[in-house]
Regions:
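Short, surface-exposed ligand- or partner-binding patches at beta-edge/loop junctions that are enriched
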Residues: 92
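Rhodanese-like catalytic fold shared by cysteine-dependent sulfurtransferases
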Residues: 2-43, 47, 55-88, 97-132
Length: 132
């Protein structure tokens, strides 16, 4: 009888651990969407665009209307902290690596609606307009 009670207690404890672990961490990644480039282009007009490449890359050409906040610069966290966390954003970069990093950091900082637009070339190929 003692063995059955111990086994039941272990099962209940395991279920509680699974429920607690499943409940943790889901909120930050839920804020980040990763749509196809075509879908992301359809979202451009309704979002604040952030080019997370270096200032030199940005100066060489960027998606029309985007602002530049370099994700690898030391002041990235302070610059995003000044933004409205409830507003919708779309971040992009050269290859998609840095936009993923930026989107994850923004979600962790409490931003509620972030689209990881990925690579600028994919967005342009899907119809995004650029400016020098």
């Amino acid at each position: 009888m003692h063995r059955i009670a111990t086994r039941a207690a272990v099962i209940v404890l395991a279920i509680l651990v699974v429920v607690l672990v499943a409940g943790c961490g889901g909120s930050s990644s839920a804020a980040v969407q990763k749509p196809s480039a075509a879908k992301a282009v359809g979202m451009l007009d309704a979002r604040t665009l952030i080019d997370v490449r270096t200032p030199a890359e940005y100066a060489a050409g960027h998606i029309a209307g985007a602002q530049n906040i370099d994700v690898e610069a030391g002041d990235f966290a302070s610059k995003i902290a000044a933004l409205d966390k409830k507003a919708p954003y779309l971040v992009y970069c050269h290859s998609g690596r840095r936009s993923g990093i930026a989107a994850t950091q923004m979600a962790a900082a409490g931003f509620a609606d972030i689209v990881d637009g990925g690579a600028m070339a994919d967005l342009v190929a899907a119809g995004a307009k650029t400016q020098p």
